Amino acid sequence: SVYCMYGNKALRIQKRKLRQKLNSEDHKKRGQAVFNHLAMTELLNQVRVLGAYIAFDGELDLSPLIKSCWKAGITIAIPQVQKSRLIFRNYTPNSKLVKTELGLLAPKADVRIPLQKLAAILVPLTAFTKKGDRLGMGAGYYDRSLKEVPDLIRIGVAHAFQEVSEVDTHCNDVTLDAVVTEKRFVITSRRGKSLPMLQYAR
């Protein structure tokens, strides 16, 4: 739709500008807050292989979470674009990071992890709704890849200001099971309350 082309494009630009304005102290605090929210759920108790990302363009910083996962023996898988799909590589404290063609950082030569091995994935985004609609950067890499593994638990990671009341659903990205921001953890209506990994730990 026309709105899809122009409305979503304008929304992406607006939200990206907001997150690019944050300073390193903001990023540090927000990254820690996101980790604190996720640490209250069963996710880190149950997951063995977790998809994550290395922050770029003002995205929410997952460093505190990733470091905690390493200590707990959880394998971290980081995406890399290959032939318009995402492939995932094991990311360890010893990984050498290289800048890929899109300007993203990815582990250079670490072991490839099949998407089917991931139990959950933390997905960056430019805008989201509380129903779990996600607007990405527009290239569709996550959409194409995640549609191949419908059972994979998808958790959007965003700044609270990236929440909107709606995004155009004719062209929006894959739906999310939950969204975590620096302010809260929201289970969306996609598969909602039925996922044990997303419940608060007792």
What spans do the regions from the language model cover?
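N-terminal active-site beta-alpha-beta segment that forms phosphate/nucleotide-binding
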Residues: 3-117
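Conserved phosphate- and dinucleotide-binding cores of soluble alpha/beta proteins
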Residues: 86-202
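Intrinsically disordered, low-complexity segments enriched in small/polar residues
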Residues: 1-4, 51, 139-140, 198
